[in-house]
Amino acid sequence: MDILKDLTGITGAGFVTDDETVLSGYASDLSFSAGTKPEAEVCPDTTEEVSRIVKWANENNMPLIPVSSPVHLYGSTIPKQGGVIVNMRRFDEIYEIDTVNRFVRIGTGVSWEKLTAALREQGMRVILPLTPRSDRSVATDHLEREVTTSMVY
């Protein structure tokens, strides 16, 4: 099995890497959890590509670890037995901002920076986590249960 060749066949060139520097960054986070370095990182752009990656992983008995931000806190994205990081950063579209009902629909890779800028243009704002990082995805903060702040008057 040639991981890079197989995954490049799914996502196209430029969206799969086995670069040591990139992969080493996934072997730990801000927690005390121990882990190992993944074999590769792949960055799909469509749900069809994600589906094909999952099918490939099942056929090759390869663990997949989904991520959507560069920073993690609780060990949830550290590979325990190698595998492939599925980086969802390219899913960074804001699908809808509903100013009447006050909600948004976003992709898993949308960062706080992108969301707050888009909402500001609409005269809106979002309740942020206690210590937001502009490059961290909104989805990651919600999945990792980051505490949000609420103004009380």
Predicted feature residues:
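Residue-level detector of anion-binding/catalytic polar loops
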Residues: 62-63, 125
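Short hydrophobic alpha-helical runs that function as membrane-insertion/retention elements
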Residues: 65-66, 128
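N-terminal flexible segment immediately upstream of the FAD-binding catalytic core
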Residues: 1-55, 59, 71-102, 131, ...
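FAD-binding subdomain of flavoenzyme oxidoreductases
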Residues: 93-97, 106-153
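Short beta-strand segments
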Residues: 67, 87, 107
